[in-house]
Amino acid sequence: PSIDPTLIDSATRPLVARITAALAQGDDGALKIIIEIFEHAGFQVVGFGQVMPELLPPLGILSHRAPNRQDQDDAARAAAVIVGMSPLDIGQACAVAGSHVLAVEAYGGTEWMLQSLIARRQAWPTGGILFKAPKTGQERRIDLPAIGPATCRQVKKAGLDGIVIAHGGVV
């Protein structure tokens, strides 16, 4: 984004070049620099899970349906995809069905990814899962992946069988 230097106070002005360079590094790089700036100013940055751990889902099956063997295999494949994409800072989610990677989250986010599945639902294998987890090395204190009711509705509309999340890594 462009930054209008006339809107920046004198205390912040020296940080503009650093913030601009960080933004060019992608989400992970930018967030790490922002945390460094706050910590250098004397703030302690903590994740909401440290302050309100009850907001993180518990370990285990959170729905009425337990995953079958194929769901488990799909989740394992999806986890490997997220780990593989992590160094590229691409996304935090993917959809897998029958061991086939149907879609990966990119710049457009999870909603866009799921909309792309909904638009071509008949072209994909049936079933499958949405997998969501932090990227390897992701700064979890201020960038924790989230899933809400709208995501759940889209997963159903896309014809996926369920959602698998990384314990302690998704809200």
Residue ranges and their predicted role:
Residues 8-18:
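Active-site gating loops and adjacent loop-to-helix segments of metal-dependent hydrolytic enzymes
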Residues 32-39:
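Hydrophobic alpha-helical hairpins/lids featuring a short glycine-rich hinge
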Residues 5, 19, 169-171:
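Short basic, glycine-rich beta-strand/loop surfaces that mediate nucleic-acid
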Residues 149-171:
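C-terminal binding/interaction regions
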Residues 18-20, 132-138, 162-165:
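Short, basic, glycine/proline-bearing loop/turn elements
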Residues 2-8, 24-28, 41, 46-153:
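Conserved mixed alpha/beta catalytic, RNA-binding, or beta-rich assembly cores of soluble enzyme
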